[in-house]
């Protein structure tokens, strides 16, 4: 009874903090409050509080249920939110190198935590006895590695998507054409002395615009390089987790069902996802290929992860149907 009450308290605390942080993020996005009051730093601290709240929630549920809390969709979502919070905290405490990971990890943790604790999964938070197939020491190894892999791959893929958005965004200034038109117009209407004065003034304005465009494009280039740098490293880490998760799942399947691979829907989509990110890593090793190509592959992998993660849960079929929406 005590553990159940504590679990509900931690759930409400984490969800309340997440809601406040989400509100702060929307306000800072709309009216740029971070320059006025410093709300953005407060939202980062809110994610840290949420991390400890989710950690306490997982440990409480572990003690209360008697097994590692990864037996259904609700628990896996909480663990996925916890994984995003870890990545966010690494970015938060590593302030010597300025990066933009928190712009990806914080909203991701917020929405996943909000979905997991919302009324959409009101039947799933109740802890239940594990089915015989899940009563194994491989549960912690296999599922935790898969969820950590999902979290890292989703984060890296979102960084790649952001890279594509920034790369294909139209930046070319129209100042050049306007100045050329003004120059010919003034040349026809004014005398040489007047035109010389105006032309000098326009040259100064043009030089200022060139400097502004150069600094903006330089910052844009630096941002693209940083997104590519972090996405490659996070996806590489997630690929390792995913590989370990698939291999441990194969060993577990052999012990339970007598076969390493059964082409279950979840297994099939996990293999497809693994192949896509293997292609991504192969592309990154080729220096002659642009970063845009690898970012496109990572964007495809982003969709495949959600299909792999939610597809079987929505259908409720196959050997992994115990984690579906309909199973509880």
UniProtKB/Swiss-Prot annotation:
GO annotation, cellular component aspect: chloroplast thylakoid membrane; plasma membrane
Listed transmembrane segments: 13-33, 46-66, 73-93, 101-121, 146-166, 234-254, 263-283, 295-315
One of the GO biological process terms: cytochrome complex assembly
Superkingdom in the source lineage: Eukaryota
Record GO terms (molecular function): heme binding
One Pfam assignment: Cytochrom_C_asm
Keyword RNA-binding: no
Cell location: Plastid, Chloroplast thylakoid membrane
Membrane topology: Multi-pass membrane protein
Alphabetic keyword roster: Chloroplast, Cytochrome c-type biogenesis, Membrane, Plastid, Thylakoid, Transmembrane, Transmembrane helix
Role this protein plays: Required during biogenesis of c-type cytochromes (cytochrome c6 and cytochrome f) at the step of heme attachment.
Family: Belongs to the CcmF/CycK/Ccl1/NrfE/CcsA family.
Subunit and partners: May interact with Ccs1.
Protein name, entry field: Cytochrome c biogenesis protein CcsA
Species annotation: Barbarea verna (Land cress)
Lineage: Eukaryota, Viridiplantae, Streptophyta, Embryophyta, Tracheophyta
């Amino acid at each position: 009874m005590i553990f159940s009450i504590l679990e509900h308290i931690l759930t409400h605390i984490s969800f309340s903090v997440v809601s406040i942080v989400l509100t702060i993020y929307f306000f800072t996005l709309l009216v740029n409050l971070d320059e006025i009051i410093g709300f953005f730093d407060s939202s980062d601290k809110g994610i840290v509080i949420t991390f400890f709240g989710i950690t306490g929630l997982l440990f409480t549920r572990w003690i209360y249920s008697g097994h590692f809390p990864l037996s259904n969709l609700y628990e896996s979502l909480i663990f996925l939110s916890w994984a995003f919070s870890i990545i966010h905290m690494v970015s938060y405490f590593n302030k010597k190198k300025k990066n933009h990971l928190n712009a990806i990890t914080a909203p991701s943790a917020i929405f996943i935590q909000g979905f997991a604790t919302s009324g959409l999964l009101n039947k799933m938070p109740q802890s239940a006895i594990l089915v015989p197939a899940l009563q194994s020491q491989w549960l912690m190894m296999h599922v935790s590695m898969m969820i950590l892999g999902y979290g890292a791959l989703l984060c890296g893929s979102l960084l790649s998507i952001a890279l594509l958005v920034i790369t294909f965004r139209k930046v070319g200034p129209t100042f050049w054409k306007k100045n050329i038109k003004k120059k010919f117009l003034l040349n026809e209407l004014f005398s040489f002395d007047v035109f010389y004065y105006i032309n000098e003034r326009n040259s100064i304005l043009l030089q200022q615009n060139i400097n502004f465009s150069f600094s903006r494009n330089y910052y844009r280039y630096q941002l693209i390089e940083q997104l590519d740098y972090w996405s490659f490293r996070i996806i590489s880490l997630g690929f390792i987790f995913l590989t370990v998760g698939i291999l441990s799942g194969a060993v577990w399947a052999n012990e339970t069902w007598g076969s390493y691979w059964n082409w279950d829907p979840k297994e099939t989509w996990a293999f497809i996802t693994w192949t896509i990110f293997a292609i991504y890593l192969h592309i990154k090793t080729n220096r002659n290929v642009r970063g845009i190509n690898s970012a496109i592959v990572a964007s495809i992998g982003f969709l495949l992860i959600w299909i792999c993660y939610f597809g079987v849960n929505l259908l409720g079929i196959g050997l992994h149907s115990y984690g579906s929406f309909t199973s509880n």
